[in-house]
């Protein structure tokens, strides 16, 4: 942070590489790293799938099989319907979100300084610390909830669910509609803000620890064990947040698909 004040350093690290202005601006760094995370996921799983053997599996094959079986077990336990779409979706969500979260473990100055060599002045590498990304994923979950509700109950059932529940009387239709709509919208919004809030806080703590390195020797020396301790703890955070996002998605789809719900 040479030549920068603490506030300038923090502001610089929290600024996106973007194009456009206002609502229509596009965060190029978020798009790039989210796509990169997806490519890494697809590459690893496709490579393991092509090299899979019925003999003694390698370490990577064992890891992939453990993750696949674990996710499939969660879906089987919580989603009581056809799992041919939901299980791969849950696996994709967990692995993709985990990889995006894991980018936060890279030292905060490394990628921005590397990008600076190419004339890129701003770069935020953690897609899940961008509310635009988490809201985008949550909106997809929102439409999947509607899709599975219509698939299991039909469009008529969807209308009944949002007009005759929880009070099964025509006089309460406006109240029911407001209550059910708020409940429905709260699902993707809470899903997005939970992931964003945790990852943004984690990123900010890494930045604040990095600020310590520019202070006197005593404070800088304290920053090293703090950085290591937070990085170790953050491994739990990034894994837990990926699991929560996946788990809540499966639960929401299960509730939407449950024919006996109403």
Curated annotation (Swiss-Prot):
Subcellular location: Cell inner membrane
PROSITE patterns documented for this protein: ATPASE_A
Residue spans crossing the bilayer: 26-46, 86-106, 130-150, 204-226, 240-260
Keyword Ribonucleoprotein: no
InterPro entries, per the entry: ATP_syn_F0_a_bact/chloroplast, ATP_synth_F0_asu, ATP_synth_F0_asu_AS, F0_ATP_A_sf
Keyword field: ATP synthesis, Cell inner membrane, Cell membrane, CF(0), Hydrogen ion transport, Ion transport, Membrane, Transmembrane, Transmembrane helix, Transport
First-listed, main subcellular location of the protein, grouped into a coarse class: membrane
MF (Gene Ontology): proton-transporting ATP synthase activity, rotational mechanism
GO CC terms of this entry: plasma membrane; proton-transporting ATP synthase complex
SUPFAM superfamilies with a match to the protein in the record: F1F0 ATP synthase subunit A
Function: Key component of the proton channel; it plays a direct role in the translocation of protons across the membrane.
Protein name, as recorded: ATP synthase subunit a
UniProt source species: Haemophilus influenzae (strain PittEE)
Gene name as annotated: atpB
